[in-house]
């Protein structure tokens, strides 16, 4: 009986320690990556704001090209949405919430499975002497306690994926000779 009591006290102490550590960890995260692309923003922006273009460069889509994608609304406009269902990439959606043409995009990303999560997907396009500085940021809140523990690893798990996405976007943008269709094109 005494051994069970000791094991119970140790287990309770570990749970308490876990909860205390989680309580002092950050309640939000922010991952930001930047790349210089040697082309004007007018060539890059449509590849990001028009959600049907994401599968051409998105690193998450590369992980599961057979995932089912659905696009709703006029591409490149506020309210346009991309939803996906896959065994590897899970189930989620992205909705465009704010745009400043060739300068800024803010979207809401919602993961339903495997782990529910809501985040802001932010894009900045800044003109430079040789092209455009593109900054991709994802930020959101972390639930207590497990989300905060997971947040410790978010940068190391996701940072390289963002870098790959920006490298794909850079390659695709610099290979184009004509800007992709924008939401205002009727072609």
Where do the PLM segments sit?
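Hydrophobic ligand-binding cavity/cleft-lining segments
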Residues: 2, 6-74
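Beta-strand/loop substructures that line and gate deep hydrophobic ligand-binding cavities in soluble
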Residues: 3, 108-163, 169-171, 181
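Short, surface-exposed coil-to-beta transition loops
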Residues: 31-32, 89-94, 117-122
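Beta-strand elements of well-folded, non-transmembrane domains
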Residues: 37, 88-90, 100, 111-115, ...
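A short, structured loop/turn motif at beta-sheet edges
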Residues: 38-42, 97-104, 124-133, 171-175
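Sec-exported extracytoplasmic/periplasmic mature domains
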Residues: 49-56, 98-104, 154, 167-175
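Extracytoplasmic/periplasmic/luminal assembly and interaction segments
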Residues: 51-100, 147-149
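Short, highly charged C-terminal tails/helix-capping segments
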Residues: 68-69, 170-187
């Amino acid at each position: 009986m005494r051994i069970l009591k000791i094991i119970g006290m140790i287990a309770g102490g570990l749970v308490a320690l876990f909860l205390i550590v989680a309580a002092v960890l950050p309640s939000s995260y922010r991952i930001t990556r930047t790349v210089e692309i040697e082309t004007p923003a007018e060539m890059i922006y449509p590849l990001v704001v028009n959600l049907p273009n994401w599968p051409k460069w998105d690193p998450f889509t590369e992980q599961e090209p057979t995932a089912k994608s659905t696009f709703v609304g006029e591409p490149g406009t506020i309210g346009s949405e991309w939803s996906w269902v896959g065994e590897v990439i899970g189930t989620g959606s992205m909705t465009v919430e704010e745009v400043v043409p060739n300068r800024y995009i803010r979207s809401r990303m919602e993961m339903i499975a495997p782990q529910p999560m809501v985040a802001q997907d932010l894009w900045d396009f800044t003109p430079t002497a040789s092209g455009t500085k593109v900054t991709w940021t994802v930020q959101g809140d972390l639930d207590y306690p497990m989300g905060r523990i997971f947040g410790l690893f978010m940068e190391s798990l996701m940072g390289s994926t963002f870098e790959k996405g920006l490298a794909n976007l850079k390659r695709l943008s610099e290979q184009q000779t004509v800007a992709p269709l924008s939401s205002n094109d009727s072609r």
